[in-house]
Amino acid sequence: MTESSPLAPSTAPATRKLWLAAIKPPMYTVAVVPITVGSAVAYGLTGQWHGDVFTIFLLSAIAIIAWINLSNDVFDSDTGIDVRKAHSVVNLTGNRNLVFLISNFFLLAGVLGLMSMSWRAQDWTVLELIGVAIFLGYTYQGPPFRLGYLGLGELICLITFGPLAIAAAYYSQSQSFSWNLLTPSVFVGISTAIILFCSHFHQVEDDLAAGKKSPIVRLGTKLGSQVLTLSVVSLYLITAIGVLCHQAPWQTLLIIASLPWAVQLIRHVGQYHDQPEQVSNCKFIAVNLHFFSGMLMAAGYGWAGLG
């Protein structure tokens, strides 16, 4: 019996693919979008823009998302829900404790970045807001809470990446708050929650086995696909209502250019909702919708700020 080298041509590409899936590069848009949108809203409404603050905040947010992704892999390995997940970082390394240590390093790096930003401003409001967001992020999978297993992950996403992150990014630029944050906060919160919602369609069997009552486990895939459709449509309705009520500048209607991804997501999940293999990539379509709609909204506020 011959032992194949881990670097053999036949296995190396597969291993690289698994590592890419484990690291989840596309998922870091959930850090980029709220910080960019919140900062753009500050510029659009107040004319304030501090590039150094934006850069530190963005890098800190990316580090915190790395903590969330890695620690969630650790917590999922503890419950056994990821036992068949080849692209789990814990399964790839075989070292749960090392992954947990690295995840906490990223958390520390993110918090230190925010602390440096707050120290320079002599204002700890942003750190306090993100502290609440970090706590909520922990409750998603972390013991003893594990609220994601109760189907509350989407609500946590909506609050954390919507009102909390947008308000923190806005405040970091303007040192103030505004009721006009409502439209972009709800918009980004829902678009982020849609990504998590889509991640459940292909893993109903594993969720059931682990006792995880995800929204798709509770609703079923067909009703879940209909809820997804309403959620996607709501992104455009919320923006239109915000414009009509003078809560958002008309330039935010640029998000209409993201409709191709919205239509693709609705059609894809509508057709394959009960076919795990075919529907499994819907979360990446959701990531595209989240990223491009968010960047378009940020561009709209930037445009408004130019007068």
From Swiss-Prot:
One of its GO terms (biological process) is phylloquinone biosynthetic process. Its main location: membrane. Belongs to the MenA family. Type 2 subfamily. GO terms for cellular component: plasma membrane. It is a multi-pass membrane protein. It holds the Pfam family UbiA. This is 2-carboxy-1,4-naphthoquinone phytyltransferase. PANTHER family: 1,4-DIHYDROXY-2-NAPHTHOATE OCTAPRENYLTRANSFERASE, UBIA PRENYLTRANSFERASE DOMAIN-CONTAINING PROTEIN 1. The chain crosses the membrane at residues 27-47, 51-71, 98-118, 125-145, 147-167, 177-197, 223-243, 284-304. The keyword Coiled coil does not apply. Involved in the synthesis of phylloquinone (vitamin K1). Catalyzes the transfer of a prenyl chain to 2-carboxy-1,4-naphthoquinone.
